[in-house]
């Protein structure tokens, strides 16, 4: 989807806030810990290339989801190590060697498929993924890890790292987290040769389980100033939200009592009301379930009335405002603020999803 720069809807990205968040997190982890910035999914909706360029001197490398995201960074001139967290297709191995990417190895079947196709693995760098309880990709048995490491090294592969991912690091109970940690440690203890880089800490682990950090951390949600737990756990220190979502009033009118708004005529004015239209809708990632949520105009909460359309919403104003008046959907306006977590709570989801769903139609502006 192409960006639409000729309408007032935009996401403002505070790159300085992201850098400050990295520095803040770095000040609370063991000295010498490598910092890997997770910029997958277009840097959680913040813009992968712009974010990576802004923080490249503050981190030791980047993490992405797939090889196409990695290629985008390399072609933009980013030279630091890039770890691809997902499983890559066999055909991607040649690209990984060409662009100097680090691949994730999650199973013996993948290695065997490479060997069956006689793919030249010499010079490839990989990290082994351990499924300690997340249930997605990764080795579960120590014997398989040892076999994989031997096979890879026999064929000229550099097994640089090993990692896992915690399912409940952002929850109040530590029971499952501790069980996962013990499984991971057991596998590490069984290895004849532990790879140089060992990382298990996502944002939540980095924030609330700092004592379990190995020698690298993966900074994701928290790097963008978001609380990985939503409202479950308090942040141990301040982080600055980097994204503001704004638009403006493009149409304002007074409607009589009984007037209806939106598809399905689900909202009917019970008195004379001032109704305004804002050019943002579900095609932009402002989903249909946001009906009745309030946005900010002139420091005042104004409810979304009627269903969210593909391209527009209608809101009820306390009085007439001129066209072009700013509307804040995420961020501060006057003395009020709407956070991504508040939006997520209203949607019964997580703040990760809120920012990731903001579509490419919304231009990102950086400062």
UniProtKB/Swiss-Prot annotation:
N6-carboxylysine found at: 129
The protein's required cofactors: pyridoxal 5'-phosphate
Alphabetical list of PROSITE patterns matching this protein: ALANINE_RACEMASE
Coiled coil: none
UniProt cross-references to Gene3D superfamilies, sorted A to Z: Alanine racemase, Lyase, Ornithine Decarboxylase, Chain A, domain 1
Stated family: Belongs to the alanine racemase family.
UniProt protein name: Alanine racemase
Upper classification of the organism: Bacteria, Bacillati, Bacillota, Bacilli, Lactobacillales
């Amino acid at each position: 989807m192409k960006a639409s720069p000729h309408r007032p809807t935009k996401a403002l990205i505070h790159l300085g806030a992201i850098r400050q968040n990295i520095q803040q997190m770095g000040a609370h982890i063991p000295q010498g810990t490598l910092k890997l910035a997770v910029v997958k999914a277009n840097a959680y909706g913040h813009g992968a290339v712009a974010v990576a360029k802004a923080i490249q001197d503050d981190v030791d490398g980047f993490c992405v989801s797939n090889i196409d995201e990695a290629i985008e960074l390399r072609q933009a001139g980013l030279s630091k190590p890039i770890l691809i967290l997902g499983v890559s297709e066999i055909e991607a191995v040649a690209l990984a060697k060409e662009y100097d990417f680090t691949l994730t190895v999650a199973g013996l079947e993948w290695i065997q498929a490479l060997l069956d196709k006689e793919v030249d693995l010499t010079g490839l760098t990989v990290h082994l993924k351990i499924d300690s309880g997340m249930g997605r990709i990764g080795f579960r048995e120590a014997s398989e890890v040892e076999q994989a490491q031997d096979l890879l090294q026999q064929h000229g592969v550099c097994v640089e790292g090993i990692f896992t991912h915690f399912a409940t690091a952002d929850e109040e109970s530590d029971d499952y987290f501790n069980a996962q940690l013990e499984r991971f440690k057991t596998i590490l203890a069984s290895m004849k040769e532990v790879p140089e880089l060992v990382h298990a800490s996502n944002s939540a682990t980095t924030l609330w389980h700092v004592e379990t950090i190995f020698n690298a951390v993966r900074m994701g949600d928290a790097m963008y100033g978001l609380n990985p737990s939503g409202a479950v756990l308090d942040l141990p220190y301040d982080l600055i939200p980097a994204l503001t979502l704004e638009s403006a009033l493009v149409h304002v009118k007074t409607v009589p009592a009984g007037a209806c708004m939106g598809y399905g005529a689900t909202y009917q004015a019970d008195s004379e009301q001032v109704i305004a239209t804002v050019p943002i809708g579900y095609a932009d990632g402002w989903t249909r379930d946001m009906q009745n949520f309030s946005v900010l105009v002139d420091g005042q909460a104004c409810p979304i009335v009627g269903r969210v359309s593909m391209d527009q919403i209608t809101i009820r104003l306390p009085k007439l405002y001129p066209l072009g008046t700013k509307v804040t959907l995420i961020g501060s306006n006057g003395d009020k603020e709407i956070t991504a977590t508040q939006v997520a709570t209203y949607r019964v989801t997580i703040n990760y999803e809120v920012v990731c769903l903001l579509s490419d139609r919304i231009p990102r502006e950086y400062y």
